């Protein structure tokens, strides 16, 4: 239950960060029309900019906190903190690459459709994870296969 609540909060935080409200479909509205494309483009660009700002801030923080402690334990703690921050930022860098790939799909009008089966991914799923490239059914199958392979 708590995990589901956190997912919903993180999905909403992406929308909040972009300064947009959840998209409201209108009756008989064409999927991935100009209005929807603009909605997701705004979300993706804001998300990418936020991640870039976070990465820049981390660099500044590491430079500010870099101290040569005489105590080896203090140095080890500091190195571990820096290592953790850098791993976190590396994940964010990879996410930026995924966002840029998704923005190219938006430009090429390939956005919003499952790469595996070609059906619509859906507005709500894309708002929850704008970089999603599989519909929920194909993603579920992919995760089941992954569990079977990895044990």
Curated annotation (Swiss-Prot):
The entry's keywords: Cytoplasm, Metal-binding, Zinc, Zinc-finger
This protein's GO CC annotations: cytoplasm
UniProt keyword annotation of Cytoplasm present: yes
Subcellular location: Cytoplasm
Primary residence: cytoplasm
A GO term for molecular function: zinc ion binding
Family per record: Belongs to the DksA family.
Function description: Transcription factor that acts by binding directly to the RNA polymerase (RNAP). Required for negative regulation of rRNA expression and positive regulation of several amino acid biosynthesis promoters.
The organism of origin for this protein: Buchnera aphidicola subsp. Baizongia pistaciae (strain Bp)
Subunit structure and binding partners: Interacts directly with the RNA polymerase.
The UniProt record lists the keyword Ubl conjugation: no
Superkingdom as given in the UniProt entry: Bacteria
Positions of dksA C4-type zinc fingers: 114-138
Annotated binding of Zn(2+), by residue: 114, 117, 135, 138
GO biological process terms, semicolon-separated: regulation of gene expression
Protein's recorded name: RNA polymerase-binding transcription factor DksA
């Amino acid at each position: 239950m708590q995990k589901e609540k956190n997912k919903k909060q993180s999905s909403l935080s992406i929308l909040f960060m972009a300064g947009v409200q959840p998209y409201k479909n209108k009756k008989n509205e064409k999927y991935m029309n100009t209005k929807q494309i603009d909605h997701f483009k705004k979300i993706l660009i804001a998300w990418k900019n936020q991640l870039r700002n976070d990465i820049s801030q981390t660099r500044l923080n590491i430079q500010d906190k870099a101290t040569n402690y005489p105590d080896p334990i203090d140095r080890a703690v500091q190195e571990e903190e820096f290592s953790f921050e850098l791993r976190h930022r590396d994940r964010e860098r990879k996410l930026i690459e995924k966002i840029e790939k998704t923005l190219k799909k938006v430009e090429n009008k390939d956005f919003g459709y499952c790469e595996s089966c070609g059906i619509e991914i859906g507005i709500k799923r894309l708002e929850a994870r704008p970089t999603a490239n599989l519909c929920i059914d194909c993603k579920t199958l992919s995760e089941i296969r992954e569990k079977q392979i990895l044990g």
